[in-house]
């Protein structure tokens, strides 16, 4: 097996970033669009378009990106979940939990609260918060560098 750069992998973490920063972009448009020479109609149209895309990505993250108790990290180039309870290693990653919660994904249905609870239970210890758990025991070429991180 080799690392497959097909461009079809999808990151739930990046989906959360899109929702968070897309929302901020829409707010910036509404507050400062006139200073950029935009008309009120252009501002309203662009902000509505951005918010519609945000809604679609947020919905996709809540459905395809939810693993039951936390957000998955991604789907690899073979459409396999990365960061799922279905695997024996690398079940949960910190990045999508924080990013999706900061973006407000799952605040309305308890997913955000559950994701943070899972972080506390599965990633947090006396020395801080781990990047992922459980750590990978061998290098996985399809995942790359993240599979070489030591425990903790």
PLM-predicted stretches and their roles:
Residues 1-152:
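Acidic, mature catalytic/reactive cores of soluble proteins
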């Amino acid at each position: 097996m080799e690392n497959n750069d097909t461009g079809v992998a999808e990151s739930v973490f990046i989906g959360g970033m899109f929702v968070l920063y897309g929302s901020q972009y829409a707010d910036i448009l509404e507050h400062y669009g006139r200073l950029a020479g935009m008309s009120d109609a252009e501002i309203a149209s662009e902000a509505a378009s951005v918010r519609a895309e945000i809604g679609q990505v947020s919905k996709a993250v809540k459905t395809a990106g939810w693993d039951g108790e936390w957000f998955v990290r991604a789907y690899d180039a073979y459409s396999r979940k990365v960061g799922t309870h279905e695997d024996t290693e690398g079940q949960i990653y910190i990045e999508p939990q924080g990013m999706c919660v900061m973006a407000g994904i799952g605040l309305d249905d308890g997913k955000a609260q559950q994701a943070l609870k899972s972080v506390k239970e599965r990633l947090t210890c006396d020395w801080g918060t781990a990047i992922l758990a459980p750590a990978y025991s061998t290098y996985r070429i399809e995942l790359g560098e993240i599979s070489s991180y030591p425990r903790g």
